[in-house]
């Protein structure tokens, strides 16, 4: 049984019906086994931060209290759990960023790739950029 580590955009798509990828995210999510999907501190914080950002969420923006409620609803689903950082994550993250050129996504994408690889999870994203990292086999939702 695979454990999946969705990026922030997948979590937003799952939680908000108005998200352009909501249907795709829900169809994927409905195939998961219990404890088959993990939040990490980075995706938790990003989900909360972006849920409350009017520039990102437009008419779907929520209050901080509502963001916590949405997070708790996701976490309360038997398919979802919170994963602590695995041992060895920082070394893997450093290795994945040491020789890369700058991009505004390098730090976060490399962190999620390193987290999934170190924990034995599968990255999940709508972003094909995750396929650029060697030794990973991300699930790109379309």
Predicted regions and their residues:
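Histidine- and aromatic-rich ligand-binding microenvironments
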Residues: 7, 105-106, 127, 142
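A generic "structured core" feature
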Residues: 36, 92-94, 137-138
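Short acidic-hydrophobic, aromatic-tinged amphipathic segments that line or gate anion-handling sites
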Residues: 82-84, 139-142
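Generic alpha-helical structural context detector
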Residues: 13, 48-49, 72
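Short, well-structured N-terminal submotif of metal-dependent ribonuclease cores
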Residues: 1-39, 54-66
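Short loop/helix-cap segments at secondary-structure boundaries that form the rim of catalytic
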Residues: 130-136
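Short, conserved alpha-helical segments within structured domains
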Residues: 42-46, 108
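Active-site neighborhoods of divalent-metal-dependent phosphate/nucleic-acid chemistry enzymes
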Residues: 76-124
